[in-house]
């Protein structure tokens, strides 16, 4: 069992976004996720979890 990768990753050549673009993208993700210890963020985390918990088991599954 191994990891299948393209030739571009094997040669070490980076294609696509620059480091600054990737950093900006992650900043956007961080700002969009409810990470603070506030009541509002906690409520948002609960709502997000409910969207992912399709089986209503209190667990995340691969289905």
UniProtKB/Swiss-Prot annotation:
One of its GO terms (cellular component) is motile cilium. Residues 1-11 have a biased composition (Polar residues). Signal peptide: none annotated. Ca(2+) binds at residues 53, 55, 57, 59. Residues 40-63 form the EF-hand domain. InterPro entries: EF_hand_dom (IPR002048), FCABP_EF-hand (IPR054322). Residues 1-23 are annotated as: Disordered. One of its GO terms (molecular function) is calcium ion binding. It is found in: Cell projection, Cilium, Flagellum. The keyword Calcium applies. Keywords: Calcium, Cell projection, Cilium, Flagellum, Metal-binding, Repeat. It comes from the Eukaryota. This is Putative flagellar calcium-binding protein. The gene is CABP.
